[in-house]
Amino acid sequence: MGELQSIGNWWMWSGFGVFVLLMLAVDMFMLDRNGAQKVSAKEALIWSFVWFAMAMLFGAVLWGWLDHTAGREIADTKVMEYLTGYLLEKTLAMDNIFVFVMIFSYFAVPLEFQKRILVYGVLGAIILRALMIVLGAWLIAQFHWVLYVFGAFLLVTGIKMFVFAGHEPDLAKNPLLKWVKKHMRITNEYHGDKFWIMDKGVRWFTPMFLVLVLIEFSDVIFAMDSIPAIFAITNDPFIVFTSNIFAILGLRALYFLLADMAERFHLLKFGLAVVLMFVGTKMLIVEWFKIPVAVSLGVVVAVIGISILLSLIATRNKQH
């Protein structure tokens, strides 16, 4: 048993927490100011770039501070871990977005309601990841062998994802959705943006509630993938948390950017599967062979980049 070493102190954690709350407020204000109007691709692209720039700026500031206080070697290592974790989590977030698109399409969710659901989706993702990071860090500190459990889980998940990447899940057969429909009264129509209504003293849940349940359930599933994956890169809770949160903060802007382009990135899931298999293997062989962080970053960049490029080429060839 032991305690995980972290570069984060109380004021860094507090400062980052305040920053996250401010950025969430900015995100909600900027994307909701047009009401029910669709967020344009241009606006979504600008905000996606802003979030990316902020993540890179944080990395630069972190490197400068560590270089001054802890030395160049630690600064290089920690920022490399941060960048690798950020890229990995951003890719998982993109896959999460494609699931959101599928859910919204299945339930024909009106645009103005999508914005509200996405707020809960982002908040749920942040809260779940924070809780799972705390749990994961505690488990690793108490039981080092948990890393091997994480590694095996990621390896199996990656293999399953690769095998079934071309199969679109049938939401009508989703066990959770079937259970909710069986045990709760569900209306056939939307009632504004309400999750339930009262009719003659009886509570009825609306399709909005079903969408919310599936969105939050998808958050749980993706958190179960992402947290073990980031712990394959670093055991530092501060690096794990900051890279995760920066990857999620721009989720709504990224959704409006990619929502109409989900089909163009159909090979991304194969790339993500390969990455998960890589990080799972990395965790399983760490006792015998430690893969440098720079190599991990290179593998993640190469695999994701190639999968996106091949997706675009395949889509272009199909159009011609």
Identify the role of each PLM range.
Residues 1-320:
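Multi-pass alpha-helical transmembrane bundle typical of ion/small-solute transporters
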